[in-house]
Amino acid sequence: MPRSLKKGPFVDAHLFAKVEAAVAANNRKPIKTWSRRSMILPDFVGLTISVHNGRNHVPVIVTEHMVGHKLGEFAPTRTYRGHGVDKKSKR
């Protein structure tokens, strides 16, 4: 269920402060964050944000198509290694 329009998008304050500082200084270094729940705003476009996936930080280059989505959607937390192989069929 989406967030109410009257509340507006949620962005952690510390992340928003880092983004504003990077835009003001025209700094292109990746911004490291653990806030997967923050929504991507139009101010984030063009920046690289390193989102934590539980083990390491995944660099996410924000484009216009990502606006309105959450940061965690672009940093997968699980690695799929395929289903188990049938040992009987190998013989």
Swiss-Prot record:
InterPro entries the record matches: Ribosomal_uS19 (IPR002222), Ribosomal_uS19_bac-type (IPR005732), Ribosomal_uS19_CS (IPR020934), Ribosomal_uS19_SF (IPR023575)
Any single GO BP term: ribosomal small subunit assembly
A Pfam family recorded for this sequence: Ribosomal_S19
GO molecular function: rRNA binding; structural constituent of ribosome
Gene Ontology cellular-component terms listed: cytoplasm; small ribosomal subunit
Highest rank taxon of the organism: Bacteria
Keyword match Magnesium: no
SUPFAM superfamilies documented for this protein: Ribosomal protein S19
Record keywords, A-Z: Ribonucleoprotein, Ribosomal protein, RNA-binding, rRNA-binding
Cystine bridges: none
Protein's UniProt keywords contain rRNA-binding: yes
Functional description taken from the UniProt entry: Protein S19 forms a complex with S13 that binds strongly to the 16S ribosomal RNA.
Family: Belongs to the universal ribosomal protein uS19 family.
Database matches in HAMAP family: Ribosomal_uS19 (MF_00531)
PANTHER family, sorted: RIBOSOMAL PROTEIN S19P FAMILY MEMBER (PTHR11880), SMALL RIBOSOMAL SUBUNIT PROTEIN US19M (PTHR11880:SF8)
Protein name per Swiss-Prot or TrEMBL: Small ribosomal subunit protein uS19
Gene that encodes it: rpsS
